[in-house]
């Protein structure tokens, strides 16, 4: 967990090739890694002072990179090129051969995850490919301070079919905290944040958890799909139990459940709003649900984005008697 996280990987003066005119112009180039503030990108400023003044840079998102290469000296001296999968390229030259080599190695490792054949890089990490593959399923978030946790700051969020995990931004193998999806009472997002309320089932404790992120919509869709899958599993288990009870007690007046389900079932009293919301999600538009002004507190934000609770039917009323947390 990084409270003073710096997303700048490398920066310096270079001569960037113009896409329109094809000429090289001197600029201050900043390479930023992906974070809660945005994706991995190159930012081009007129000079170094413009960064401190927070001017509006020209941004090139570094995604879908095919390769990073050095141009031959006879073509362009001290030049580095980033080739994208659509065969477009961004090319720049450096003031020295040493600087060009540093840019090349940094971009290769950060954009491609490649381990260059250099003794200075040390022994290859055999687990690196698996870790990097898993990293693609993690989102960049900034956990805001909350009374239930001692940690806050920049981290990685991962959603599996059962849990939400937070991982350390510097060491992808260090798990910071986790929440079972079946402990979620409600969740929502806006343009810059993702928020959920967890019950007492989780180790982190009951409360609101808010994350600043540019990927709130993607996180929301992952969480919603996973919770719907758990709810469907819950429904199937209950139907199977009811079927078994009827078969075992056929012809008798007394009904009793023969055993408890083997699958972990959600125990939250708020759980039934998730299954019912699937039917009403298409009826309400995104603008109607999320077009209101930004809430003044985290609770107002969450209440504004909560999945709407459907009107209980006679059949649902029996399921709603699940013991509360």
UniProtKB/Swiss-Prot annotation:
Tissue: Widely expressed. Highest levels in heart, lung and kidney.
Positions of short motif DKFBH motif: 265-275
PH domain sequence ranges: 7-112
Listed GO biological process terms: cell surface receptor protein tyrosine kinase signaling pathway; nervous system development; positive regulation of MAPK cascade
Stored InterPro entries: Docking_Protein_DOK (IPR050996), DOK4/5/6_PH (IPR037816), IRS_PTB (IPR002404), PH-like_dom_sf (IPR011993), PH_domain (IPR001849)
Coiled-coil stretches: none
CDD domains associated with the record: PH_DOK4_DOK5_DOK6, PTB_DOK4_DOK5_DOK6
KW Transit peptide (keyword) present: no
Modification after translation (UniProt): Phosphorylated on tyrosine residues in response to insulin, IGF1 or RET stimulation.
Family to which the UniProt record says this protein belongs: Belongs to the DOK family. Type B subfamily.
Domain comment, as recorded: PTB domain mediates receptor interaction.
Function description: DOK proteins are enzymatically inert adaptor or scaffolding proteins. They provide a docking platform for the assembly of multimolecular signaling complexes. DOK4 functions in RET-mediated neurite outgrowth and plays a positive role in activation of the MAP kinase pathway. Putative link with downstream effectors of RET in neuronal differentiation. May be involved in the regulation of the immune response induced by T-cells.
Subunit relationships: Interacts with RET and TEK/TIE2. Interaction with RET is mediated through the PTB domain and requires phosphorylation of RET 'Tyr-1062'.
The protein's name in its UniProt record: Docking protein 4
């Amino acid at each position: 967990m990084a409270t003073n996280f710096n997303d700048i990987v490398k920066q310096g003066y270079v001569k960037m090739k113009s896409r329109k005119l094809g000429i090289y112009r001197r600029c201050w180039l900043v390479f930023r890694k992906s974070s809660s503030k945005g994706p991995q990108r190159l930012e081009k400023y007129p000079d170094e002072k413009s960064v401190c003044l927070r001017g509006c840079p020209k941004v090139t998102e570094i995604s879908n990179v095919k390769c990073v290469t050095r141009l031959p000296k006879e073509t362009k001296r001290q030049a580095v090129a980033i080739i994208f999968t659509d065969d477009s390229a961004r090319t720049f030259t450096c003031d020295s051969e040493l600087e060009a080599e540093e840019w090349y190695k940094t971009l290769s490792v950060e954009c491609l995850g490649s381990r260059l054949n250099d003794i200075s890089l040390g022994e290859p990490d055999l687990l690196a490919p698996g870790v990097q593959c898993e990293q693609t399923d993690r989102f960049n978030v900034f956990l805001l301070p909350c009374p239930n946790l001692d940690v806050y700051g920049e981290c990685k969020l991962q959603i599996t079919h059962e849990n939400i995990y937070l991982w350390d931004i510097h060491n992808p193998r260090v798990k910071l905290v986790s929440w079972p999806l079946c402990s979620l009472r409600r969740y929502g997002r806006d343009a810059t944040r993702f928020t959920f309320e967890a019950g007492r089932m989780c180790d982190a404790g009951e409360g609101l958890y808010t994350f600043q992120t540019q990927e709130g919509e993607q996180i929301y869709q992952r969480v919603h799909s996973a919770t719907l899958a758990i709810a469907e599993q819950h429904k199937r288990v209950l139907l199977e139990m009811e079927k078994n009870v009827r078969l075992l007690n056929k012809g008798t007046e007394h009904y009793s459940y023969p055993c408890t389900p083997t699958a972990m079932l959600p125990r939250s009293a708020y759980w039934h709003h998730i299954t019912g919301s699937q039917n009403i999600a298409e009826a309400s538009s995104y603008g109607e649900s999320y077009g209101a002004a930004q809430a003044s507190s985290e609770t107002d934000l969450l209440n504004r984005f909560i999945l709407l609770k459907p009107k209980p039917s006679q059949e649902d009323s029996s399921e709603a008697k699940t013991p509360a947390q």
